Swiss-Prot record:
Keyword Protein biosynthesis carried by entry: yes
Organism the protein comes from: Schizosaccharomyces pombe (strain 972 / ATCC 24843) (Fission yeast)
PPR repeats: 137-172, 365-399
Pfam families according to UniProt: PPR_3 (PF13812)
Subcellular location as annotated: Mitochondrion
GO cellular component terms listed in the entry, alphabetical order: mitochondrial matrix; mitochondrion
Keywords: Activator, Mitochondrion, Protein biosynthesis, Repeat, Transit peptide, Translation regulation
Protein name: Pentatricopeptide repeat-containing protein 8, mitochondrial
Organism domain of life: Eukaryota
Length: 481
């Protein structure tokens, strides 16, 4: 079966004379041969400024990397912007900056949601790469492709795939690295709606340009193309060959699940995960697996398919189960919203948490406690609030802005005091400031709802005074209860 992918693509080459470069890619190539737009920009800076930057470039790059590591968003963006005109940003720093931006927006808005500011910054990085071709490594293109895909910007990812393919001949001849880049480009083209023939050209290039040395990537391409374009016979043979060849990586699993789920093949994605002899070396990232669980639940409105994946992880990679536990607990609340059966939800959560407490590898995170606070709100049961606090104390967990948002939501529906509410609010302000996020209307309205939802509190007058103080601070006005 090892030569299976090569056989498929040799047929494609014979039938369509497939080549990587077509008119679109030839047009895109001019982006990389045109003179850099910044070629004369540095002359607008004084000689002293230019000399200072040259002498201190390593220190400035270190400062930028330190700011990213500390998650100082405002400072990072400012430092990056100040360094960009001098052309001293190296490939590794650029790659870290892309991941810094995208991971932050995914943390705030979830997968598939992007704000205009982040999108503008990504587009700006792409322009920088066009002007400074030396930073456009294979890893750079892969990160750019994955970023736009994670943000569901498939049309843009498809365009970047064309750019990366046109740039391929300028990259160092490392077959494994280039093979993976071809797979990322194929992923983007499939999700961008490319035809079977267009996808086949990329698959053919893996064999043709890399001289048949990347068998696993060839097989992955066959598996993706023939699953999406619904040739079950070839798809099954490709999958069997991949399992037998034992060369899959976590990167491949991420790509396969991303393509299948985004093309509506959620059950095939779950089947791939469970039936490919995956282990800690080639399981998808936990971020991708959590996303798959969410999409499986949306497709089946049941926790059962999720629990089979959870049990698989428990057997082959128990170190990852905390994130999966958090996801399943959160989705159990969506199940409750459908069933409206408090006893069923309570029994499931209690049984599930008890099961996890017997697993020695299970180490709750602050997200686990946050989820318990959310459960307390949904079920209007103070015992889950207490369970969350106990977990924070027992495991020494560090609360985040999400923790205090969740607490304020819980205090809307459960017995609460002015002291509890004011402490949660002050901590929320502090945590938001620490990650360079301003207090927005949604936070103000959450505080209003929290205080106005229980007019019969014993200390409601103190609550109203606190609310007016906060509203005055942010220039807001009280809304009628």
């Amino acid at each position: 079966m090892q030569g299976f992918g090569s056989q498929i693509f040799r047929k494609l080459l014979r039938s369509s004379n497939a080549k990587v470069s077509d008119a679109l890619l030839q047009n895109t190539r001019t982006l990389f041969t045109a003179p850099p737009l910044h070629s004369g920009l540095q002359t607008s800076f004084t000689a002293e400024t230019q000399q200072h930057v040259r002498q201190n470039s390593q220190n400035l790059l270190k400062q930028l990397n330190d700011e990213m590591k500390a998650r100082k968003y405002t400072e990072t963006v400012a430092t990056f912007s100040s360094l960009k005109p001098f052309g001293i940003l190296d490939s590794q720093t650029i790659n870290r900056y892309i991941l810094f931006l995208v991971d932050r927006i995914k943390m705030l808005n979830g997968r598939g949601n992007v704000d205009e500011a982040t999108l503008d910054k990504l587009d700006d990085i792409l322009r920088y790469a066009i002007e400074h071709q030396e930073i456009a490594s294979a890893r750079f293109w892969r990160i750019m492709l994955q970023s736009y895909i994670d943000l569901n910007l498939f049309d843009k990812a498809s365009l970047i795939a064309d750019m990366s393919l046109s740039h391929m001949e300028f990259l160092p001849k490392d077959e494994r690295v280039l093979g993976n880049l071809y797979i990322s480009a194929l992923q983007a083209k499939i999700l961008g709606g490319a035809s079977f023939e267009q996808c086949g050209k990329i698959g053919s290039a893996i064999h043709e340009q890399l001289e048949g040395k990347e068998v696993v990537n060839e097989l992955v391409a066959v598996y993706l193309i023939y699953t999406v374009f619904k040739d079950q016979g070839i798809s099954s043979k490709a999958h069997k060959a991949l399992v037998q060849f034992n060369g899959l990586t976590s990167f491949h699993s991420d790509v396969i699940i991303s393509v299948f789920v985004n093309k509506g093949l959620v059950d095939q994605a779950a089947a791939y995960l469970k039936n490919s002899n995956l282990n800690e070396r080639n399981l998808p990232t936990i971020y991708t697996t959590v996303w798959l669980l969410q999409r499986l639940f949306e497709a089946h409105h049941s926790l059962d398919p999720l629990l089979t994946i959870f049990d698989y992880y428990l057997s082959v990679s128990p170190k990852d189960i905390t994130r999966l536990t958090n996801a399943i607990l959160s989705l159990s609340m969506k199940q409750f919203e459908r069933d409206r059966d408090i006893k069923k939800a309570t029994d499931f959560i209690t049984t599930f948490i008890n099961k996890m407490s017997d697993v020695k590898e299970f180490k709750p995170s602050i997200s686990t406690a946050n989820t318990l606070f959310s459960i307390a709100s949904r079920l209007k049961d103070v015992k889950w609030l207490s369970a969350g606090f106990d977990m924070i104390d027992k495991y020494g967990l560090k609360p985040t802005h999400v923790t205090y948002r969740s607490l304020l939501k819980a205090y809307c529906l459960l017995p609460s005091t002015c002291e509890q509410i004011s402490q949660a609010w002050v901590n929320l302000e502090y945590r938001l400031e620490a990650i360079s996020i301003s207090v927005a209307d949604k936070e103000i309205n959450l505080l209003k709802d929290c205080i106005l939802s229980q007019p019969d509190r014993d200390d409601q007058q103190s609550c109203l005074q606190f609310l007016n103080m906060v509203l005055s601070k942010y220039g807001k006005h009280i809304r009628s209860p």
